[in-house]
Amino acid sequence: MNTTEKIIVKENKTLKLNNVLIREVSQNELVDINKISYMMDSYIKTKGNATVGPMINYSSAEGDENGQVKIVIKLMVQLKNPIHNIDKPYEFKSQIRITNCLFGRFSEKEENLQFAYSKLQVHAFENDIKLKGDSYTVFVNKNEEKLVADVFMELDKGGTAIEGL
């Protein structure tokens, strides 16, 4: 039996990112997400900059004007230095700070990553914690056997719990 915990959950954690380059990924671009990631790296190099740390994936669900659920996905990387004069489709934020998050450290095969999100949602449900409905996934380390990822889910500042989408 494996005694290593696959998903460790902690409450009241803070996600802090500095010099963040952000690229929103549209629904029809999802199949090209690896290409988009490569293009981000190329863009950073053409600006004479370099990344610090791993890729971060932001996701949330929003309703559109027709009442349809739209999934929002953004790729983010931290940079060594700020970039000025950002070109579309990129945006830059000097700092992103998300306080009071539910946190999960996932250490398992990449195809099982969805269980980290599920475990955090179940933990929130069992402890009457209201989640905002978005998540930040920091891809800490990856090899052939396993992925280590940190998942941050922002708590809702009041209001009702997010219903299943």
What kind of feature is each model-predicted range?
Residues 1-165:
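A solvent-exposed interaction/effector surface
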